[in-house]
Design a protein with these regions (language model features):
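Active-site hotspot residues in diverse enzymes, especially metal/ion-binding acidic/histidine motifs
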Residues: 1-164
Length: 164
């Protein structure tokens, strides 16, 4: 079970975190009965800057999974781009290469130290869409059986994944 606790409305952020956590599972970083809590969910959770070898490997796994290739980076040769321009370029690239445009934007933001621009482009890409957390949490609470879980587990789930 992967619980998304990053308070981001971005589908791209949430898909990266899921891919990162799947990486931990696929790479054998956790035992079947072990609970893993990834507490660093800021920019570094995307940046490959965490000094922990397992975290770097899970990040690399996620980037490869989301791009279909390892070590993917996206840059800007013009040096001057608007949020709309970045969103449009990411959408075109994403369609042509079957890569989520939001992931292209996050990757671009990290590698070009352009987080404000990236977050503005993410908002444009997600215009009119429900925030990721609302949809994911709704699915969790529709599928989970609280009657078979301990009360402290249910309390934790309500704190990290509140029902809307």
């Amino acid at each position: 079970v992967i619980i998304l606790s990053k308070k981001s409305k971005s589908w791209a952020w949430q898909s990266f975190i899921i891919a990162h956590e799947i990486g931990h599972c696929a790479l054998g970083h956790i035992d079947p009965d072990e609970i893993l809590i990834d507490e660093t969910l800021g920019e570094q959770s995307y940046a490959l800057d965490d000094p922990d070898v397992d975290e770097q490997a899970a990040d690399q796994y996620a980037i490869t999974l989301l791009n279909g290739r390892a070590n993917a980076t996206y840059g800007n040769s013009t040096g001057n781009m608007s949020a709309l321009g970045l969103a449009d370029a990411a959408m075109q690239y994403g369609k042509a290469n079957r890569v989520d445009p939001g992931h292209v934007v996050l990757n671009f933001a990290k590698h070009n130290d352009a987080w404000a621009l990236g977050m503005a482009a993410i908002k444009l890409l997600q215009a009119g869409e429900k925030p990721a957390g609302i949809v994911v949490n709704d699915l969790l609470w529709r599928c989970i059986r609280p009657d078979v879980l301990p009360d402290d587990t249910i309390d934790l789930l309500y704190r990290v994944a509140p029902a809307e």
